[in-house]
From Swiss-Prot:
One of the GO biological process terms: mitochondrial ribosome assembly
Protein name, UniProt field: Required for respiratory growth protein 9, mitochondrial
Keywords on record: Cytoplasm, Mitochondrion, Nucleus, Transit peptide
Lineage of the organism: Eukaryota, Fungi, Dikarya, Ascomycota, Taphrinomycotina
Organism superkingdom: Eukaryota
Presequence range in chain numbering: 1-46
Main location: mitochondrion
Region ranges (Disordered): 89-117
Name of one Pfam family that matches: Neugrin
Cited function: Required for respiratory activity and maintenance and expression of the mitochondrial genome.
Length: 117
């Protein structure tokens, strides 16, 4: 095999590999552009889940990795894009300070509701 045929063979293999990875990249970019066009530029979901639900979604996904984003979205009544973003976001479990803040807020809301009753 002469050098020309060998170079051509390598080039063809590389270009086919590049085309396959480039095609996947293009599909991802198309989906990203479609989502941006659909949501109007920036992400602002209509239904926002509390932190406990987000932690539960992450836990469910870890336990049952076979569950798709669509299945989780139906379970929680949000869009699959919301679930995808929740899973992509950093996993931040509630710490003690945040739990105590929530308890204080809850107690304050009970006190204020009692004042109006």
């Amino acid at each position: 095999m002469n050098i020309f045929n060998y170079t051509t063979l390598i080039f063809r293999r590389l270009s086919s590999t590049f085309k396959a990875s480039n095609k996947a990249s293009i599909e991802w970019k198309k989906q990203n552009i479609a989502v941006k066009r659909k949501i109007g530029g920036y992400w602002n979901p209509k239904k926002k889940l509390p932190l406990e639900s987000m932690d539960e979604i992450r836990r469910l996904k870890k336990e049952k990795s076979s569950m798709s984003c669509s299945e989780l979205a139906k379970l929680y009544g949000v869009s699959p894009e919301s679930i995808r973003r929740i899973l992509k976001s950093s996993n931040r479990p509630l710490d003690d300070r945040e739990k105590s803040r929530k308890e204080k807020r809850w107690l304050n809301s009970l006190k204020s509701n009692r004042d109006f009753a």
